[in-house]
């Protein structure tokens, strides 16, 4: 099993990617929030990459919602990459909570990068 990781990468296209690997919950949510806030404070568009995340709970969903709201207020792009064959539990959590309609959730990281670079973070 992959260890839980939170990695921040800045792309040449001016978009930051926060990639979550493994399981994320109440214990990792504050660290995810800190990284999201750090990126958005710079006015940088953001992609949350969940393609390698096997589990997220409601505390992580709250952090994602707060990040999307902050991106919207700063008028910077925000998108989520779920992966073509994303982990079913993560996809289901986003579907059940209705968050797939709240911010852009795209099947591939490259699509999420393009969406975030366009400045659109969902309404």
Language model regions located:
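STAS-like cytosolic regulatory interaction modules
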Residues: 1-52, 66-123
């Amino acid at each position: 099993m992959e260890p839980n990781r939170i990695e921040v990468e800045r792309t040449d296209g001016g978009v930051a990617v926060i990639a979550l690997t493994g399981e994320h919950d109440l214990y990792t949510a504050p660290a995810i929030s800190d990284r999201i806030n750090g990126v958005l404070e710079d006015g940088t568009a953001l992609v949350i990459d969940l393609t390698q995340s096997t589990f997220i709970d409601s505390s992580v969903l709250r952090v994602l919602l707060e990040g999307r709201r902050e991106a919207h207020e700063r008028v910077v792009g925000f998108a989520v990459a779920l992966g073509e064959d994303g982990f079913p539990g993560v996809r289901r959590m986003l579907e059940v909570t209705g968050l797939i309609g709240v911010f852009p959730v795209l099947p591939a990281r490259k699509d999420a990068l393009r969406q975030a670079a366009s400045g659109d973070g969902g309404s």
